[in-house]
Regions:
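GIY-YIG nuclease signature motif recognition
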Residues: 1-3, 122
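Aromatic/basic micro-patches that form nucleic-acid/chromatin recognition or nuclease catalytic surfaces
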Residues: 3-82, 151, 155
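Domain-scale terminal segments
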Residues: 37, 91-93, 127
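Divalent-metal-activated hydrolytic enzyme cores
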Residues: 77-102
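Short boundary/loop segments of OB/S1/cold-shock single-stranded nucleic-acid-binding domains
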Residues: 96-116
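Structural detector for short beta-strands of small beta-barrel domains
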Residues: 118-126
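Short aromatic-glycine-enriched beta-strand elements
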Residues: 130-134
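Structured surface patches comprising rigid loops and adjacent beta-strands/short helices at the edges
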Residues: 139-155
Length: 155
C-alpha cells in the first residue's frame, strides 16, 4: 500500500491494527516482499469473521520481528539485489490502532445482494471496513458504488 494511503487502506479492509514494515521504490519490489511474507501469514481478509467482531490486539512489532526472522534469508537476498534505496526496513514505526463504530456485531453474517433483492431494510448497527452492519444483514457498500441508492430514517 502506498504510504499516502495509510491508514485508509487498513480502514477499508476492516483492520483494527496496522504497522508499516517496508518502504519500497516500486510496486514490483512490494510484490516480491509480499510473496516472501505470505508463505508465513495469510494475506486475505476473511470478511465474514471480520464482521463478527474484533480480533484480540497483537503486539505487531513483535509479530513483525518474528516474521522478518522467518524470511531473513529471502529478504536479505532482495535487499542485496535492489539495495537500501529499493527496499528499506521500517523498524521504528508505531502501531496504528483503528476503532470502528459498531454497537453490535452479527452472530451470523448474512450478506445483502441488491441485484437479487433490491430492497433491504434494517437498523444500522455499525460500520466496519467497507461494510454497513444492519440488524438484518451486512452489505459491502463499495460493491454498489455506481448504484442509485435511497436511504430513509424513521424516528
Amino acid at each position: 500500500t502506498r504510504g499516502d494511503q495509510l491508514p485508509t487502506r487498513w480502514i477499508d479492509q476492516g483492520a483494527t491494527q496496522g504497522l508499516p514494515i517496508f518502504r519500497v521504490t516500486n510496486r514490483r519490489h512490494a510484490g516480491l516482499i509480499e510473496d516472501r511474507l505470505r508463505q508465513h501469514v495469510a494475506d486475505k481478509t476473511q470478511w465474514q469473521r471480520m464482521l463478527k467482531g474484533n480480533n484480540d490486539d497483537l503486539n505487531l512489532p513483535s509479530v513483525r520481528d518474528d516474521l522478518l526472522e522467518k524470511c531473513r534469508l529471502d529478504l536479505q537476498e532482495l535487499s542485496d539485489q535492489y539495495g537500501l534505496q529499493g527496499i528499506q526496513l521500517l523498524d521504528q514505526e508505531l502501531t496504528t490502532e483503528i476503532a470502528f463504530p459498531v454497537e453490535q456485531f452479527p452472530k451470523k453474517v448474512k450478506s445483502f445482494n441488491l441485484d437479487k433483492q433490491p430492497l433491504m431494510e434494517g437498523v444500522l448497527q455499525g460500520i466496519k471496513g467497507q461494510y454497513l452492519i444492519l440488524d438484518t444483514g451486512v452489505i459491502n457498500i463499495r460493491k454498489y458504488t455506481a448504484y442509485n441508492v435511497e436511504f430513509s430514517v424513521e424516528a
